[in-house]
Amino acid sequence: ENIQNASPAPGISEAILNADGVILCPSNPFISIGPILAVPGIRKLLIQTGAPIFAITPIVNQRALKGPTAKMLEELGYPVSPIAIATLYRNFLDVFVRYSVSVVIEFNQEFAIR
């Protein structure tokens, strides 16, 4: 409510534009990341920055890591998948990180981890 009257906190614009990288943590895209992206100017800053922008999926094996993300995706008509999350950030995202069992197995074998 009244998000159109909000503005980035002091220093945020400069921080995004001068960042070496931006990471969107594996959080709910609607109730955690969404309100931040709804602040006027934030999406534009993410598009304008020269920094690579990474997002980490909060969906693994069609389930949320925590919270209501999977349920919300379903209720809003999205598939419960990492790809659905990536599409929400598509206009500014450079790298999308998702869980892959095969990568974990290769990593574990490579580094002799259980």
Predicted regions: what they are:
Residues 103-113:
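N-terminal low-complexity segments that are often proline-rich with Ser/Thr-Pro
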Residues 85, 114:
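Short phosphate-binding loop-to-helix
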Residues 1-83, 91-93, 98-101, 105:
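Conserved catalytic alpha/beta core of Sir2/sirtuin-type deacylases, generalized to analogous enzyme cores
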